[in-house]
C-alpha cells in the first residue's frame, strides 16, 4: 500500500470511521472522526473526504453507523445519498448496502467488503494501466485521483505509482485545479510523499506545455462514466481533453467499474454547483470584488471522441458502448 497513507480507516473497537481531513492538507495531517451517519454526511458534503470511490466507501460506513446506532436506515440512506449529486460511486455503494440490509445481512460487513474491494480494484488499475507508460514519460494529471480519492493507490495515480514502482523514470505535472486546489494540495502531497517527481502548474499553463512538447500523456480519474463513454470528472477535464486532441497527446481515464453508470443518459446527470465563495475567496481572503458573482461548477462532461481509452480493473477499453458493456458480462 502507499506507505502509511490511509485515507479511510474503520476502528472496529470504537465503531468509528476515521478519515484524513483533506481540507487541512498539505500543511497538516489531521483526522476527522465520524461516530454517526450525520458526521459522515457532513464529511462528504464539506469535502473532508472527496473523490468518487472514497465517497462511496465512506457513505457505506455511514450507513453502517446508522445501523450500529439504531437509527432509521432509510432516513440515513436519503441523507447520505443527497450529500453530493454527481459521483455515481456514492449511489452504488449505498444501494449495495441497502440491499444487504433488506436481505438481513450486516451493513458493516458489506461496507468492509466494499472497502477491501476498492483497495484491490485500485491496485489492479495501476498494474494494468502502467503498461501504457513509457520510461521517460512526463504525465499530466488533473485534480486528485490518488490514494486520497480512494481507499489506497488511487485510479490515475495508481497507474503513475505502479510505473514508478516498476522502475520507470517518470515525471508528473499536476494542475493546481482551482478553486479547491486538489492538484496543488493533494496530488502534489501524495506524490512528494512517495518520492515521485512532481511539479505543480497553474491550470492555464497546461496548453502551453503541450504546445512546447513537454507532455507525453494525460491521465485523469472520473466521477461518472456513461455507457457510451461520456466522462464526468472535475471541472477542467474537458478543456484538457480538447487541448490533448489538438496536440495529439493520448488522453486516458482511469476508473473502477463502480464509476460506470449504465442506466443514465446525459440528461439524468446533475452537475454539482458549489458555493461561489470557493471561487471568490482563497484561504479566507476575498479576491473577487464585492457584488461580483462567480460560477462554481464542480464537474464537466468530456465526450468519448476526446478520450483515447479507459483504464479499468478488468482491462483497457475504448470509450464506446460495445466495449464498455463487455466489461460487465
Curated annotation (Swiss-Prot):
<comment type="function">
    <text>Catalyzes the interconversion of methylthioribose-1-phosphate (MTR-1-P) into methylthioribulose-1-phosphate (MTRu-1-P).</text>
</comment>
<dbReference type="GO" id="GO:0019509">
    <property type="term" value="P:L-methionine salvage from methylthioadenosine"/>
</dbReference>
<feature type="binding site">
    <location>
        <begin position="50"/>
        <end position="52"/>
    </location>
    <ligand>
        <name>substrate</name>
    </ligand>
</feature>
<dbReference type="InterPro" id="IPR037171">
    <property type="entry name" value="NagB/RpiA_transferase-like"/>
</dbReference>
<dbReference type="InterPro" id="IPR011559">
    <property type="entry name" value="Initiation_fac_2B_a/b/d"/>
</dbReference>
<dbReference type="InterPro" id="IPR027363">
    <property type="entry name" value="M1Pi_N"/>
</dbReference>
<feature type="binding site">
    <location>
        <position position="84"/>
    </location>
    <ligand>
        <name>substrate</name>
    </ligand>
</feature>
<keyword id="KW-0028">Amino-acid biosynthesis</keyword>
<feature type="active site" description="Proton donor">
    <location>
        <position position="223"/>
    </location>
</feature>
<protein>
    <recommendedName>
        <fullName>Putative methylthioribose-1-phosphate isomerase</fullName>
        <ecNumber>5.3.1.23</ecNumber>
    </recommendedName>
</protein>
<dbReference type="InterPro" id="IPR042529">
    <property type="entry name" value="IF_2B-like_C"/>
</dbReference>
<dbReference type="InterPro" id="IPR000649">
    <property type="entry name" value="IF-2B-related"/>
</dbReference>
<keyword id="KW-0486">Methionine biosynthesis</keyword>
<feature type="site" description="Transition state stabilizer">
    <location>
        <position position="143"/>
    </location>
</feature>
<feature type="binding site">
    <location>
        <begin position="233"/>
        <end position="234"/>
    </location>
    <ligand>
        <name>substrate</name>
    </ligand>
</feature>
<dbReference type="Pfam" id="PF01008">
    <property type="entry name" value="IF-2B"/>
</dbReference>
<dbReference type="InterPro" id="IPR005251">
    <property type="entry name" value="IF-M1Pi"/>
</dbReference>
<comment type="similarity">
    <text>Belongs to the eIF-2B alpha/beta/delta subunits family. MtnA subfamily.</text>
</comment>
<feature type="binding site">
    <location>
        <position position="182"/>
    </location>
    <ligand>
        <name>substrate</name>
    </ligand>
</feature>
<keyword id="KW-0413">Isomerase</keyword>
<dbReference type="GO" id="GO:0046523">
    <property type="term" value="F:S-methyl-5-thioribose-1-phosphate isomerase activity"/>
</dbReference>
